[in-house]
Amino acid sequence: ASTQHLCGSHLVEALYLVCGSNGFFFNPKDGIVEQCCHKPCSIFDLQNYCN
């Protein structure tokens, strides 16, 4: 899977796309910003944050 840097609203939009109706929890303290903004992350990384 391709990885990409996702920051701010782009990160939230990507979570909406990946998680769909399951929803997701966005807590910067969980490290998602470090994992997906500071470093590139994949769809599989994003799925870890879905509810």
Swiss-Prot record:
Annotated GO biological process: glucose metabolic process
PANTHER family recorded: INSULIN, INSULIN/INSULIN GROWTH FACTOR
Family: Belongs to the insulin family.
Protein's organism: Anguilla rostrata
Disulfide linkage: 7-37, 19-50, 36-41
Subcellular location, principal: secreted
Organism classification: Eukaryota, Metazoa, Chordata, Craniata, Vertebrata
Source organism superkingdom: Eukaryota
Single GO molecular function: hormone activity
Name recorded for this polypeptide: Insulin
